[in-house]
Amino acid sequence: MKYIKWFGCFAMVTLATCLTTTAQQPQEGAQKGKYLIILQAGKEGHEGMARAVHALLYTEELLKHGHQVVLVFDGAGTEWIHEWSNPATQDKLAPRYRELQKQKVTEIVCDFCAGAFQVKKDLQDRKVSLTSEFEGHPSIAKWADLGY
């Protein structure tokens, strides 16, 4: 019997809470999953920092366990990629982010939101790829169709 696992860091589910629908213990040799983690929280306040920490933490853990992970920077979350893509950043989360980059995590950055949060030009100058597949935003349906 195949169990469906759903990992939600969506704003509509609550960014700070990432859930899996099964309570079973992982089995050796179990099939690896595909996860889409969406960071929509901005840099303002303790809550935004906590959500960013957990997006990076859960991405790292899933990668270490052999799962496929796509990390999406959407909404105010584009402020984080703006900070972390700056080579001169002193942000304390930047080293963890850079480790994920070394592991070749797939990153998606919302084109529309980068503009709305006034970080688009800097991201383009830093050669950060921006995605606008559905009304200026990344397509979530595309990733769902791919099993994420």
Q: Where in this protein do the model-derived segments appear?
A:
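Bacterial N-terminal signal peptides that target proteins for export
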Residues: 1-8
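A glycine-rich helix N-cap at a beta->alpha junction
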Residues: 87-119
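Boundary at the C-terminal end of the N-terminal hydrophobic targeting segment
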Residues: 21-23
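A short aromatic-anchored loop/beta-hairpin motif
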Residues: 99, 117-138
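Short internal beta-strands
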Residues: 59, 69-75, 107-111
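Histidine-anchored nucleotide/phosphate-binding helix
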Residues: 50-66
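Bacterial N-terminal signal peptides
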Residues: 8-18
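Short, glycine-rich nucleotide/cofactor-binding loops
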Residues: 30, 36-53, 81-85
